[in-house]
Amino acid sequence: MDGGVGEAAAEQLAAAREQGFDPPFRRQDWPLPSLPCRADGPLIWVALTQAVTPLEQQLNLVHQRVADLWTQPLDQVRILQRTLHCNWKIAHDNTLDDYHVAVAHPTTLHREQGPVRDYAHHATALVNLLVTPHADGGCFHTFGLPPWLHLITWPEGRLALLEVLPRSRDSCCMQLRLFAPSAASGGAPADAANNAWLKELLAFLDEDQALVESAQRGYCSGLVPGPPHG
């Protein structure tokens, strides 16, 4: 259902269209269960089962720390998908790990995330957050959200949502979506700025893809990791 169409209006539209099918569509022949859904931030969230952790618990740090950015009018300005030749867990656990960024991406994302000495960590049972001061003022937030989401926020209101979606034992889909404040998302200057923003993030993600795919090859080679550092 379109997020801008109310339930009653959607029912009326569906009923009118069903009569035009050949043969006529009979809804009782397709007993589809209803799924709970709700809008929160720029997204519509759908629960595929009743036994889910409440959305408030999944997003509690987002609501606490960046509520103004999260609830402002936003437009999705870019979307990109690519296949990673590694399983989703390797990609998810390494892509935005804070110290990994500092070591592996010194000339890309680390320039925005800032020096390690300024790292401030926050966590709940489900969510982790890294907060660093941004060079342009305000704070840069990097969230890890269940089950395979990463959210990055810039102090002026831009958001990047990175999803690592499972495909097979040794591949996954990386989806990047960029959101900008609605008041500043139109026109040629905004389009050029969004292209530059996407280019910057892709430089980081190109580096990251090489790293996580090499980790997958290492595990497949029979590598046995050593003990954790004490």
What kind of feature is each model-predicted range?
Residues 1-49, 57:
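Rieske [2Fe-2S] iron-sulfur-binding domain
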Residues 35-39, 43-230:
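C-terminal catalytic domain of Rieske-type non-heme iron oxygenases
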